[in-house]
Amino acid sequence: MMQELKILNEKRAEIYWWLSSLFFKELSEQDIARYHSAEVRTFLSGLADEQSLNREVKHLVEALNRLQDRQDAQLELAADFCDLFLKSDRDSALPYASVYADQGLLNGKPAQQMRELLSAHGVKVEQNLNEPEDHLAIQLDFLAHLAISANQIEHSAQLSLALQAQSDFISQHLLTWLPAFAERCTQFDAFGLYSAAARLALAFIQQDKHCLDELIQETH
């Protein structure tokens, strides 16, 4: 079981790092070209094999296909990113937990809690990401770190605690605000790529928590 769990954690971390990259910064021309490659399309097809993710992966692939026909695709997609995630007006979907959990204020209690968690686990935020620690990209990256770190554990009791910590993080730091974030993305993202990514992130996180909770029961 331990070897199977290590493989699973590596796959989970890969998906979390990928999701984090979508909300980290605008996609470059090279990034967009990769999304049209056989390698990435195979990766997405693999995700779609999971029934709970199938619909959201389909929406993301449809948006990527539309992107091939979009004039000035990179510039237009960068504008979508800016309008959704970088503007502080009512027609945006800011990717910070504090906005949804702390009277709409930036850098609130969720950011402080994330700072404490990152420090406790010795995780440093990338220097070029000048954002509060409750940014979605940072939270997803941290979850990937927790998944990979669990692979260093050999004893089942400690492993159960590590899995519980991941489940608790999802409950306390992501599912508290991600549904509202995904809803706002859907409301304000006319083209639909980032709203599809947000809904896929939410679906994967919900499914991952269910999987973690089952694993916790098995390791007891």
Swiss-Prot record:
A Gene Ontology biological process term: protein complex oligomerization
Cross-referenced InterPro entries = Chaperone_TorD, DMSO/NO3_reduct_chaperone, HscB_C_sf, TorD-like_sf, TorD/DmsD_chaperones
Query: What does the UniProt entry say about where the protein is found?
Result: Cytoplasm
Q: Which domain of life is it from?
A: Bacteria
Q: Which UniProt keywords apply?
A: Chaperone, Cytoplasm
Annotated Pfam families:
Nitrate_red_del
User: Does Protease count among this protein's keywords?
Assistant: no
Q: What Gene Ontology terms describe where this protein resides (cellular component)?
A: cytoplasm
Can you tell me which family this protein belongs to? Belongs to the TorD/DmsD family. TorD subfamily.
What is this protein for, i.e. what is its function? Involved in the biogenesis of TorA. Acts on TorA before the insertion of the molybdenum cofactor and, as a result, probably favors a conformation of the apoenzyme that is competent for acquiring the cofactor.
What this protein is called in its record is: Chaperone protein TorD
